[in-house]
Amino acid sequence: GRVKVVYSASHLLHNPEVEIERSSAHSPFEHTGRAEKIRETLAADDAFEFVSPKAWGTEPITAIHNEGLLRFLSTAWADYQRDVKESREVVPDMFFKSNLREKMGDRVEPESVNGKLGWWCFETTTPLTVGTYEAARGAVDVAMSATQIVLDGAKNSYGLCRPPGHHATSDLYGGYCFFNNAAIAAHHVAKSTGTKVTVLDVDYHHGNGTQQIFYERNDVQFVSLHGDPARAYPYFTGYAEVTGSGKGRGSTLNLPLPARTDDDSYMSALEQACESIK
């Protein structure tokens, strides 16, 4: 049979015109055209059949993410227009760092939307727009629906998720990611079937969010090939010596690749990644 591709046009609602990256404002690298190019290519191939996602609600999201992050993203853009100024894109001015409040008692989410932006977001390239929350919810529905197709008996499926997800941690958004689509789907499989799940991440950047979410769990393995964080985003995570902790010790495998890695070296690393999946 044909491979089912789950796609939602809701991703078009997240359409920022600018991002702040490398000390400059420019048009976003993560834009609607990325997903549309994939859609057009697959739609022209008879091997694929397009289906729409089902609505899964917020429960799969809050199984993985802090409810405060969900609540914030649902109103943040509108709150900013009301409380700060009218702005097509909304980004933080300041980020919370734990040592700002070292020895000063419990951390508390700020009341102002400017404070909340820096509380829930970790970098500047991920603007909120009027439709971002709806698009992010749609991407979760796509991931969950594609996963359910396999749970219902299909050999495979493809979830065309946008916005992406693997940089979103349990309580932070950033790196173009709002909710961690793959982590939400992997958790759903692990909990509904009782079987071990592996997330194999082959994006150029390390999936810091997916790693963080499953770092102390042994029911979801995280395996990642990525550019060496000594020189590549997200810089702070993705090192080979990081392998999980507690029950999750040994369930994380990072394979950082040096600059100018050729095809043979990449395939060798991919083979190592696949052999680790059990």
Which ranges hold each PLM region?
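HDAC/HDAC-like amidohydrolase catalytic core signature
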Residues: 1-200, 204-278
